[in-house]
Regions:
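Active-site/acyl-donor-binding loops of N-acyltransferases
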Residues: 1-11, 17, 145-205
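Low-complexity, flexible helical/coil segments
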Residues: 37-40, 75-83, 127-132, 141-144, ...
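Glycine-rich loops and low-complexity Gly/Arg-rich segments
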Residues: 1, 27-30, 66-70, 118, ...
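A conserved beta-strand-loop-helix scaffold within acyl/acetyltransferase catalytic domains
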Residues: 1-126
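Acyl-donor binding region in acyl/amide transferases
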Residues: 110-168, 175
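Short, surface-exposed, charged/polar-biased interaction segments
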Residues: 23, 43, 50, 79-82, ...
């Protein structure tokens, strides 16, 4: 995963260290958004009358995005409510002319910011809404929360490297005790499932 040690780092200094391509993308996107109408970023951190609407905006954008459907959609809503109760939520919503076009869920705890969920409306892709909102939330956690580290959590997506500075590899290990019935059954389910997925993928191509 990708992370950013950032103790004492201001957003201005942080952004100056980003690749020039990313800086240009954000600058151009801001100009495009300004020309298109009224762009606004709201960052929700506490419970209140606007939180439910912000969560609904995230859910709506997520459904319109390229992301696969949530297996447990109610989990995200409950997590946001709980995190807001504890002051750990940073739910950002970027809107254009009153219509939400991007949303991200960050969580802040014990000096670390975790980028948990993000999505944007594909119809608004020309505005680079994901980059604009990431920049806004990064500014918030660096200058307001003064976190010591930002963590992009799992995934090695290329775009994460533009925002982070350190790459941390994680390797998983799974083992089965084949001398026991339970171990044999678990192994059969695991490897049988892998073969079934591979077979289905072959059929789809």
């Amino acid at each position: 995963n990708w992370r950013l040690p950032c103790a004492g780092l201001s957003f201005v200094d942080y952004f100056a260290q980003r690749p020039s391509a990313l800086q240009n993308t954000v600058h151009r996107a801001r100009k495009k958004l300004d020309r298109a109408g009224i762009g606004k970023v709201d960052i929700h951190t506490q419970q209140g009358k606007f939180l439910d609407a912000a969560i609904s905006a995230f859910e709506s954008i997520y459904q319109r995005s390229w992301k696969p459907a949530e297996a447990f959609p109610d989990f995200v809503r409950r997590l946001c409510v709980l995190a807001a109760q504890k002051g750990k939520l940073r739910l950002g919503v970027l809107s254009l002319n009153g219509i939400a076009i991007a949303s991200q869920i960050w969580l802040v705890d014990q000096g670390k910011a975790y980028i948990f969920k993000l999505a944007y409306d594909p119809d608004a892709a020309r505005f680079s809404p994901g980059s604009l909102l990431t920049a806004a939330l990064m500014e918030h956690v660096l200058d307001f929360d003064a976190v010591d580290e930002v963590d992009y959590l799992s995934g090695d997506d290329a775009y994460k490297q533009d925002w982070m500075s350190h790459r941390h590899e994680r390797h998983g290990l799974i083992a089965f005790d084949l001398a026991t019935p339970r171990g044999l059954l678990a192994a059969a389910r695991h490897y049988g499932g892998k073969k079934r997925r591979a077979w289905r993928a072959g059929e789809a191509t």
